[in-house]
Amino acid sequence: MSARLIYVMDPMCSWCWGFAPVADALVQQARAADVPLHLVMGGLRSEASPLEPSKRRYILEHWQAVEEATGQLFLREGALPEGFVYDTTPACLAVTAARSLEPERAWELVKLIQQAFYGQGRDVTRPSVLAELAEQAGFSRQQFADAFDSPEQQAATAADFTWSQDLGIAGFPTLLAERNGQLALLTNGYQPLSELSPLLGRWLERAASA
């Protein structure tokens, strides 16, 4: 029997940050049942131009709404500074690079990127920042940098984006449970742990007895 928890997300997605404590608890619940996590990057934004002031205001208002809905704190003061290009591709590439090196440890990097961006206001579109965070997560800085710069991981990141699009996933966070190639949707969008933990628990019980 082959089973895994698939989390389709983007490290720079505000709802994924709001969902972070729930996701972490579910990952631990699955791992306790020997079901590993597989991360798929969704590719939220690939902007090429700096944010317009009106767009920045809109995003910060959205962050406030997510904070109110989930209880996750966002650092809004000084966030998204003038000239910031909201391109999530480098952060996604960082996770696929980490996944290629140590799949289980990639989750630690996701959490560090989210905390750096939403909790500390750091520019996680910069490769140097991502390399620093990867080192904090326990990766060799040089090995990470080599993977980050490799055509193979650029292709893997693009393949993640395509996979989620082909599956019809229109929003993040999306959590799937896979058993023997069959996918079950746990959630598309934020839900509290009180709703999702029993749902995952029932799926894990069925997976264990399959």
Placement of each model-derived feature along the sequence:
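C-terminal cap of thioredoxin/glutaredoxin-like
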Residues: V8-M12, F19-Q29, L112-A210
